[in-house]
Amino acid sequence: MAHQAHAYHMVDPSPWPLTGAVAALLLTSGLAMWFHFGSMILLTLGLITMVLTMIQWWRDVIREGTFQGHHTPPVQKGLRYGMILFITSEVFFFIGFFWAFYNSSLAPTYELGECWPPTGITPLNPFEVPLLNTAVLLASGVTVTWAHHSIMHGDRKEAIQSLTLTILLGLYFTALQAMEYYEAPFTIADGVYGSTFFVATGFHGLHVIIGSLFLSVCLLRQIQYHFTSKHHFGFEAAWYWHFVDVVWLFLYVSIYWWGS
């Protein structure tokens, strides 16, 4: 291999973006097939493809960044910019849902009874499960910051403990949200209230699941001594977790508290 006289990472050709795209197509098509025809074949195939893609893509990135040293300071700087742009795109993604909610709730039409929540909808009590969920997510924000500071100070044991606690809080939040959905007195088919509620909180819940998965990989890497006090970009991408926290606060204030 020729000597590389610059600090930038020339990425090798990779099949994982393509297999990831195929998995995404299978998942979305599979969901439609499952909803309308009760068949889970495509959905299962999509899930298997997605899991295999994620495992092998993570393996490649860990090898390049940790063992081959390709993630030099300029490369890490580029990755940070990429993460900031990704989170910015996610902000606009959620702005769309808030826009739909406020557009419907600030000027409810006569079909909704000219009131909000619409006639016939019994909203959830914001001071029960939603308030507990808020406390759980805020606590997870504290523990993930604790984990970050532990890694920066080289305190391996505390980093593992706090990261484990963060993941458990994320899973607890997901379980509470699933229970809330199961017991909700309205469904996604109940007009604009049901659709905006379930789409906004559902996509947020999906982000919590993805974040928990990424933090689990960070935990495994921390256990295997991959992170140092100076080189731990994989964990710094936990900015995503703080973003999920902030989105939930807006959801809680807008949809659960004000919207009820």
Swiss-Prot record:
Record GO terms (molecular function): cytochrome-c oxidase activity
GO biological process: mitochondrial electron transport, cytochrome c to oxygen
GO CC terms: mitochondrial inner membrane; mitochondrion; respiratory chain complex IV
Topological type in the membrane: Multi-pass membrane protein
SUPFAM superfamilies named in the record: Cytochrome c oxidase subunit III-like
Stretches of the chain found on the membrane's Mitochondrial intermembrane side: 35-40, 106-128, 184-190, 256-260
Spans traversing the lipid bilayer: 16-34, 41-66, 73-105, 129-152, 156-183, 191-223, 233-255
Localization per record: Mitochondrion inner membrane
Major localization class: mitochondrion
Reaction(s) this enzyme catalyzes, per UniProt: 4 Fe(II)-[cytochrome c] + O2 + 8 H(+)(in) = 4 Fe(III)-[cytochrome c] + 2 H2O + 4 H(+)(out)
Short name of one Pfam family: COX3
PANTHER family reported for this sequence: CYTOCHROME C OXIDASE SUBUNIT 3, CYTOCHROME C OXIDASE SUBUNIT III
Subunit structure: Component of the cytochrome c oxidase (complex IV, CIV), a multisubunit enzyme composed of 14 subunits. The complex is composed of a catalytic core of 3 subunits MT-CO1, MT-CO2 and MT-CO3, encoded in the mitochondrial DNA, and 11 supernumerary subunits COX4I, COX5A, COX5B, COX6A, COX6B, COX6C, COX7A, COX7B, COX7C, COX8 and NDUFA4, which are encoded in the nuclear genome.
Name this protein carries in UniProt: Cytochrome c oxidase subunit 3
The species this protein was found in: Xenopus laevis
Gene name for this UniProt entry: mt-co3
